[in-house]
Structures are given as structure tokens and as C-alpha cells.
């Protein structure tokens, strides 16, 4: 019987927003197991490493050069019959590494019902009929926009950023302020519903702005950011609501305008939470959540779909009407968007791992398609033994050297190596590196689908 451990060859996309040449983690990881004709070009952007069975960029078994999709469909036991049946013989998740040099589009991913409708109506722009909730884990310091800000912050920016108020329209801005005044933090369901309707009206008005008005407002906005960064987006008599990082916001606006001159995204910025993630920090985005990534290297895991509804910071197809109609208009502080990891209980660490403060952390979003475990083994000989799972896993090494064992099969692991581990198989990883403790950390991320305890999360709910 085949040992369910496959080393994978994974493709990398070269979108314009990717980090260039060897600066790109996605490129470095791809090069670790690349075809012989692949070399990293010094001036080419490398954006996304894809690990999975999605047909747009399918992973291959290094040994046989067969696609992973072929292999899991030929042998249902690799994913387990239950997972294979539930997800049509395809891996339920798409695992990625993103290397971001400049902003990705302001976007959201449709829920299952909308995805089916969009795919039927416009399969060229919406190639999948699946939803796409996704989780982001920072490898390097990350900047992004995620979800609508608390309403009080939006009200502040409407007053403090004159070009924003001009672009939306004074009357529309005033109507919003009047609608939410005194109810910005309400927990009453009916009032919250009214707040969301008001936010939808305001945001839709912004997104439907005429291009000549956007251009004029953008010039004024950037001029303000350049001339007075310390008081940017601030009011004289509003110490409680003024941003604590005015100069940082000004510099980001200037940077975004250099990347996408006079773009509507410069104004969407004031509606969305600005987030920084340090390595190991994470956030989870439900389907229909608005977001944009600005910079950094990240691990990303999502339901297997490539659907994106875009409306800013992009030269690609923009679908403003669909975006403004599909959003939930939920609003919350950024801390509520972050996902806190917990100790993963199904790993056994050996003595060398325990004594070196090695750990396995679980990032477990409230959906059935995937979870991710980050394991850091901080000493030579440190070992982690993972209990068998009832579904498939994909593991990538992002630092250090080690080995991976499943059954009687053992493979060496280096930075960028990617492996598929089949269902119901015990998996052992071990640090085989050398050097001091700080330098000698063997780090892996493992995405997996285990339906145990998640049977009720039908369709991600």
C-alpha cells in the first residue's frame, strides 16, 4: 500500500503586486522544488505560491509528476472517503504563500449562494461556484485593511477629511451622521440593522463617485497628507477621536497613491480598519468581508475558490455594483477580526522540544474546510508527533531544516519544501538543523481538513 506522504511541486503566480525576484518568499519557496527550467528572475514579481488541487495552478507529486488532484481522485483513502464525497474529490482548501510588495485590490469573496449565481452569469470573471472564507497568518510584518471600522471612526473621518466629505456629498455625509448619532456602539439588533443600512448608503455613494471627482479629491487628499502629516485626518478639538498614528496614515496614503494614483481606494481606506500583524498573528475573513492587503509575506488558507469581487487598487475588472450589494456592512474594531491561536492538543513533543520551548499552535476558524497548525521546533532533535487526522493535510516549511516521517517513509525538509499527508496517518517532524537556538528553528505550517466535531458547519455556517 502506498505510504500517504507526497512531496509536492507547487506553482507560483507573477501578479504585478508581488515582491520582486529573490525578495519574494513565494518565489524562494517555489524554487525549492521547481522544474529544472525554473529560475527566479531578478526583476520579475512573484506573488502567490499555490498548494492544492485548484485547476488554475495545481500542485504535482515530485516523484511521478502527476497532479495531486489525479492522485487523490484515484485513491479516495488519501483524503478519506468522507472528505472526498463531501468536496467532490477535490481538496477542500487552497493553501498559499503571498509576498506583497504593493496593495492588492479592495475586494470581497462571495458567499456560496452568490458565488453560484455569479459563476453562472459570468464564468470568465467568476471561475468558481464556491464560497471563499480565508485566514491570513503573517510570516513577516504585514499591513492590510480588514472590515468596516467602528462607526464613530467613520464619522470622525467624514468631519476631519474634507476631500472625503466632498466626494461623498455633504448631504449624504450629514444624513449618515444623523442616522447613527448616539447609536454608534448599540447592541440593539434593530438599531444595528438601521446602522448597516445607513453605512451601505454612505459607502455605495462613495463607490459610485465620478472619476473626475475622485481625481480632484485625491489630489487634495495627498496634498494634505504631504503638507501636514502630524495633523492628518485630525480635528482641532477632537482628542478622543483623532487617530493616534496620523503621520503613519498620511505616509500610507502617499504610498498607496504612488502605487495607484487617484484611486477610489484612497478614500475606502477611511472606511476600513487598518491592521498590522506581527509574525504569527492572524485574522479570519468571512465570505462577504471587505479587505485589502497592503504589504508583507503571509500564509493564507481558504476554501478552494478563486472568486474575487474587486472595486479599487486594481487594473483588473471592477464590479462595484456587486461589491456594494453583497457586503454585510458589519462593523467592528480590528481586534474582533483577529484570530487568536491556541495550543494544538493533538501533538506530542519530545523532551528536546519541551526543554527548548517548542510549540504547536492551532489557528481554527469557525468553518469546516480548514484549520492550520504552526509548529516551531527550537533545537536540534526536537520532535513533534501529530496524531492521525480523519482528513488530508498539506505542510510547508518556512524556515530551518528537518525531516518528516509517515509510516516507514522519511524525507528531508528544507525551507520551501511542501508535502501532502494523507488521512489517518501519524506524522512526525524533527529539527535536524545546526547552530545556536535563535538561528536553529524549524518552522512548519500545516493546513488540514478534519470534519470531526465540525459536521454541523454545513456550507461554512
From Swiss-Prot:
| Reaction(s) catalysed by this chain's protein | D-mannose 6-phosphate = D-fructose 6-phosphate
Any one GO CC term of this protein is: cytosol
Cite the InterPro entries for this sequence. Man6P_Isoase-1, Mannose-6-P_Isomerase, Pmannose_isomerase-type1_CS, PMI_typeI_C, PMI_typeI_cat, PMI_typeI_hel, RmlC-like_jellyroll, RmlC_Cupin_sf
Q: Which UniProt keywords apply?
A: Cytoplasm, Isomerase, Metal-binding, Zinc
Q: Which cofactor does it need?
A: Zn(2+)
Query: From which domain of life does this come?
Result: Eukaryota
Q: What residues sit in the active site?
A: 310
Where is it mostly found? cytoplasm
Instruction: Report the pathway entry.
Output: Nucleotide-sugar biosynthesis; GDP-alpha-D-mannose biosynthesis; alpha-D-mannose 1-phosphate from D-fructose 6-phosphate: step 1/2
Main role? Involved in the synthesis of the GDP-mannose and dolichol-phosphate-mannose required for a number of critical mannosyl transfer reactions.
Identify its protein family.
Belongs to the mannose-6-phosphate isomerase type 1 family.
Q: What is this protein called?
A: Mannose-6-phosphate isomerase
Amino acid at each position: 500500500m502506498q505510504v500517504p506522504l507526497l512531496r509536492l511541486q507547487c506553482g507560483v503566480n507573477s501578479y504585478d503586486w508581488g515582491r520582486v525576484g529573490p525578495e519574494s518568499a513565494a518565489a524562494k519557496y517555489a524554487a525549492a522544488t521547481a522544474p529544472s527550467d525554473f529560475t527566479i528572475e531578478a526583476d520579475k514579481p512573484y506573488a502567490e505560491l499555490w498548494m492544492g488541487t485548484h485547476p488554475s495552478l495545481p500542485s504535482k507529486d515530485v516523484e511521478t509528476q502527476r497532479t495531486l488532484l489525479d492522485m487523490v481522485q484515484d485513491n479516495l483513502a488519501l483524503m478519506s472517503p468522507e472528505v472526498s464525497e463531501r468536496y467532490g474529490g477535490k481538496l477542500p482548501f487552497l493553501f498559499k504563500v503571498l509576498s506583497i510588495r504593493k496593495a492588492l485590490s479592495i475586494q470581497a469573496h462571495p458567499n456560496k449562494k452568490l458565488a453560484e449565481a455569479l459563476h453562472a452569469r459570468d464564468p470568465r470573471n467568476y471561475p468558481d461556484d464556491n464560497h471563499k472564507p480565508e485566514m491570513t497568518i503573517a510570516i513577516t510584518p504585514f499591513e492590510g485593511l480588514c472590515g468596516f471600522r467602528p462607526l464613530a471612526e467613520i464619522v470622525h473621518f467624514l468631519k476631519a477629511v474634507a476631500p472625503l466629505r466632498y466626494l461623498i456629498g455633504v448631504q449624504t455625509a450629514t444624513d449618515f451622521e444623523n442616522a447613527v448619532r448616539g447609536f454608534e456602539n448599540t447592541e440593539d439588533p434593530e438599531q444595528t440593522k438601521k446602522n448597516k443600512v445607513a453605512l451601505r448608503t454612505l459607502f455605495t455613494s462613495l463607490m459610485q463617485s465620478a472619476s473626475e471627482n475622485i481625481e480632484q479629491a485625491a489630489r487634495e487628499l495627498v496634498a494634505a497628507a504631504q503638507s501636514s502629516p502630524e495633523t492628518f485626518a485630525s480635528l482641532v478639538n477632537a482628542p478622543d477621536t483623532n487617530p493616534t498614528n496620523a503621520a503613519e496614515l498620511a505616509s500610507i496614503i502617499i504610498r498607496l497613491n504612488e502605487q495607484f494614483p487617484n484611486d477610489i481606494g484612497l478614500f475606502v481606506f477611511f472606511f476600513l480598519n487598518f491592521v498590522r500583524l506581527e509574525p504569527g498573528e492572524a485574522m479570519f475573513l468571512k465570505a462577504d468581508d471587505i479587505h485589502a492587503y497592503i504589504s508583507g509575506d503571509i500564509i493564507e488558507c481558504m476554501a478552494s475558490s478563486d472568486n474575487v469581487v474587486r472595486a479599487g487598487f486594481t487594473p483588473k475588472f471592477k464590479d462595484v455594483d456587486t461589491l456594494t450589494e453583497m457586503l454585510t456592512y458589519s462593523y467592528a474594531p480590528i481586534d474582533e477580526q483577529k484570530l487568536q491561536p491556541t495550543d494544538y492538543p493533538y501533538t506530542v513533543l519530545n523532551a528536546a522540544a519541551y526543554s527548548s520551548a517548542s510549540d504547536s499552535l492551532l489557528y481554527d476558524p469557525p468553518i469546516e474546510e480548514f484549520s492550520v497548525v504552526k509548529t516551531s521546533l527550537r533545537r536540534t532533535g526536537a520532535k513533534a508527533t501529530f496524531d492521525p487526522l480523519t482528513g488530508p493535510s498539506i505542510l510547508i516549511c518556512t524556515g530551518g531544516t528537518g525531516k518528516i516521517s509517515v509510516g516507514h517513509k522519511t524525507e528531508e525538509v528544507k525551507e520551501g519544501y511542501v508535502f501532502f499527508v494523507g488521512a489517518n496517518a501519524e506524522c512526525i517532524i524533527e529539527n535536524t538543523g545546526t547552530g545556536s537556538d535563535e538561528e536553529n528553528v524549524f518552522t512548519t505550517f500545516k493546513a488540514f481538513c478534519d470534519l470531526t466535531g465540525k459536521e454541523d458547519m454545513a456550507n461554512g455556517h
